[in-house]
Amino acid sequence: MRSVITTLTLVASVGLAVAENGFDGWLRYAPVSCHGACQKSLPSHIVTLDPTESSPISVAGQEIQDGLQRMFKMHATVEPKGCSTRSSVIIGTLDAYNHACKDADPVPELEEDGFWLNTKDGKVQIIGQSERGALYGAYEYLSMLSQGNFAPVSYTTSPHAPIRWVNQWDNMDGSMEHGYGGLSIFFKDGVIPQDLSRVKQYARLLASIRINGIIVNNVNANASLLKPENMDGLARIADIFRPYGVKVGISLNFASPSTLGGLNTYDPLDESVISWWGGITDELYKRVPDMAGYLVKANSEGQPGPTTYNRTLAEGANLFARALKPHGGIVMFRAFVYDHHISEENWYNDRANAAVDFFKPLDGKFEENVVVQIKYGPIDFQVREPVSPLFANLYKTNTAIELQVTQEYLGQQSHLVYLPPLWQTILGFDLRVDGKPSPTRDIISGQRFNRPLGGWAAVVNVGTNTTWLGSHLALSNLYAYGRLAWEPTLDSQDILQDWIRMTFGLDRRVLDTITKMSMESWPAYENYSGNLGIQTLTDILYTHYGPNPASQDGNGWGQWTRADHEAIGMDRTIKNGTKFTGQYPAEVAQVYENIETTPDDLLLWFHHVPYTQRLQSGKTVIQHFYDAHYAGADTAQTFVSQWESLRGKIDPERYEHVLTRLIYQAGHSIVWRDAINEFYHNLSGIADEKQRVGHHPWRIEAEDMKLDGYVPYDVNPFETASNTKAIVTATNSTTGTASTQLDFKTGKYDLGINYYDFYGGKSQWTAYLNDRLVGQWQGNNEDVLSHELSVYLDGHSATRITFRDVKIHKGDRLKIVGKPDGMEPAPLDYVVLLPQGIVD
């Protein structure tokens, strides 16, 4: 028998590379087999045309030199001039190439930041429209080599949109809002520290996926970033990013003229305010001449903004746009503006209406260097939402889409969720503006409405963890974001497989296994967290992590489900509801207005229906809930065995790191499944046709065991404990024992123990069979996993440990001893004994 929950013993395997910690991401440049003619085809010289010190051209040459050395043990010299293509790779801008190589092959037409890569006829030519484009081409060439692709190619590629940014929600104290990969790499104790050593590697990763801008601080901004010493620090950050073609920008606090500048107003039309922002902007550009611009969150979730002074959001955005215009900077102005104190008692209130209500009347009133940054859905990064109708309502305004790489509502990197298939439901959706093809991707590029600016922003939130995001597999989402921002019609699985080959090597089983797991992960998470468009049924008032469907309703945040004993869902129709459907162009509105034509996966987003409403699948809503939550959790169980099939094919450190998370996810998916099903079973009173919900024949409730030093505890929310109760030690210094005589047939079982591991202590548990040790463990999720922790017994802290292949004899006595620590009273929920092949 063996325990599966926290870090397991690392076993060295013959032939494996030295253990890796994830710091290199996909830029590992791991050894690639290349012999004979292949080896001879590799360049021995690298010609960098007209490089300046620390320019993207110089970086491109260094990257290729390093890549060739690490992948093929080949030392290539770097030379600053020359046009000979024999055994050489030539890197440069189009202008430099035409000047230095007048008789060379003509280069096809390139758009801004585009590049031409040619490896035919024994040549390697990487020519960019700009220095940044040439660097992108160098990374493209290295990507091919690292995947074992030596086929001759010749093609040009250019970006889908000019803005391809990432946002970091880093705070000045070094913490991070909704970051699950450690502390900030930019800030500490209110300042920008001297040690910025991780920033260069982040710049490399971003450049390799063609990201050209970064906002380094939280949208809930602290005005102290604008102090002179911190502006100096921003200059140091920008100096690190600049050679990689990534421009630095910052988030602003709208009230800074008052909170930092000492003015008695922050009215955007006040001359003193205008002058103050002009001076601050000038000071920033003195230090960072190529600063990207500003990101602004205003009049949302308590943040200050122009409406305080009865000014419009456009007047607020234009304040910054005019200060930036002489310097060439842009304003990304977030459309995430809504009232979080609206009353659910009013049937017609709807947070989803807010963006169009606020911004549509302002179309055409923004300066040309303003870009309205719009979240992909009308609410907030949910597991499934319809596309935001605001994209279809701004004809005369630049727009960008806002995605989330950090998994705020989607498992917080403790659950595997590959996000591009979700994003593609938004990017490819045809909004049919004026009855014409209008996919979202063509609106944000500026193509559909002939706008000069537009593009992409993603909240990433890398941190000091060596995996960057808290999980090795989560990095696939950052990689894919960059690839899609360049070309949004790429296939999500193709992108994923490029990332797998660069990250984990070329073994076919590794490729197929991680592909299968990843492509199944978003549908599985949707199934066990919230489906039919009901949103992610997480605790929206606390951690945004574990299940708590009741938290959606009864408050002013507007993420309502309107679930009661008879019906569920938001009526957003024109006929009877909030009229949200009317914000879409007519062809789309007509689809969503009618239950019969609304897709099942968005039914509860647009309609309030009885639990017995039949779906297009033929199932009732409530039975679909039950079935989907079981199906999703069942899929999550398979991730463990799939990953275990790769033992010996992946270096031990990364293998064990991922395995720990997948084992945890398998257990937590059951917590999700049971919590949601029990909640709606209790609310609706409708039984599961398959008699699974509320029936757990393999479980023994902890409160039904013989207790010594333990006492029963009513868990809140009730559905996050099996049978609503758990047990805790009588005091925080009392060791507790729970024991029971087993009435199961003799045989081998997997012994699962569900417990609660919350912040504020590291309890210890030991399990015995007839006084024979089965296993022991510690409540140390805070040291092992990435998600936001709870200080309660709830769906966030609920965890399962499993001991496999335990030999049980009927009549054996199972005993669990819990030793509390700190605030944590060694809580237990239940034990389960599962015959092999049975999922609880």
From Swiss-Prot:
Signal peptide: 1-19
Gene3D superfamilies: Alpha-glucuronidase, C-terminal domain, Chitobiase/beta-hexosaminidase domain 2-like, Glycosidases
Broad class of where this protein is predominantly found: secreted
SUPFAM superfamilies noted in UniProt: (Trans)glycosidases (SSF51445), beta-N-acetylhexosaminidase-like domain (SSF55545)
Keyword terms: Carbohydrate metabolism, Glycoprotein, Glycosidase, Hydrolase, Polysaccharide degradation, Secreted, Signal, Xylan degradation
Assigned EC number: 3.2.1.139
Assigned GO CC terms: extracellular region
Pfam hit, one: Glyco_hydro_67M
Protein location: Secreted
UniProt GO molecular function: alpha-glucuronidase activity
Signal listed as a keyword: yes
Glycosylation site list: 222, 310, 465, 527, 576, 682, 732
UniProt-listed GO biological process terms: xylan catabolic process
Catalytic activity of the protein: an alpha-D-glucuronoside + H2O = D-glucuronate + an alcohol
Functional description taken from the UniProt entry: Alpha-glucuronidase involved in the hydrolysis of xylan, a major structural heterogeneous polysaccharide found in plant biomass representing the second most abundant polysaccharide in the biosphere, after cellulose. Releases 4-O-methylglucuronic acid from xylan.
Family membership noted in the UniProt record: Belongs to the glycosyl hydrolase 67 family.
Protein name: Probable alpha-glucuronidase A
